Amino acid sequence: MNTKQIKRNAILGILFFLPVTFLLFLYPAKHNYNTLDVLTNGVLDLNGFSSDADAPILLEDHLTVLGFFGMHPIGKHTTASNLKELVYDKFKGFKKFQIVIVLPEGTEEEARTLKAELMKYEELKFWHFVYGSPNSIKAIHQSLNVPDALDANLATDHVYIIDNELSLRGRLDDRTDNELASKKPVYQKASYDAIKVADLKNKMSEDVRVLFTEYRQKRKGNFDSTSRRANDLKGTDE
């Protein structure tokens, strides 16, 4: 066998075994991935809220990015644009995905103006504005049980991930590698600041992807949750 044949066979062997080795490396991760933590159960649904959609807009049975734009939604143009470009455009093709923005009754015209600006290049089929009373909006936000609050206009730049069982998802431990190495105190990530591009691009997009992976594994019957729940941390020194 000449040198050229030896080289050729070696290259073919590498091309054959490299993908197989890569798949074998990934196989354990497929079945032992970390799921997105449940932070709050029993988030209130949107019963009684109105919208421009033909059917009622609800959180249950959907993966929802939930936001509160308050009495002046047009003033949240930057927040909305970031959400559209960094989250909506990435996940709009996934089954049951939606972005829902909660607004006070009486803001319908301003909301339509904002949506028209976002719809310059495409229809936002999975983006919904819903309208309710101030008390109903406060009740929805309070049910999230998060540290950040709505302002006097019932608005916040923070957005939230709600799963199909009406649970708030996020991270029980959002420490960086350096913070872990330094043994900094544990802190959660219950919301994502839509003004900060990095927060949406690097954290929220990743967390939504992880949740869709969880749903896919459940459908295939391969789901084995290794995530920690909020109750698991009670009574620990972590």
Model-predicted regions and their roles:
Residues 1-50:
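N-terminal targeting signals for export/organelle localization
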Residues 95-109, 125-135:
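Thiol-based oxidoreductase modules, predominantly thioredoxin-like and allied folds used
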Residues 115-158:
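Short, internal strand/loop/helix patches
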Residues 79-101:
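Conserved helix-turn-beta segment immediately C-terminal to the redox Cys motif
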Residues 156-157, 161-238:
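Thiol-/selenol-based redox modules, centered on thioredoxin-like
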Residues 67, 99-101, 161:
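Structural beta-sheet core signal
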Residues 71-76, 105-109, 176:
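Short acidic, S/G/P-rich loop/turn micro-motifs used as interaction or catalytic elements
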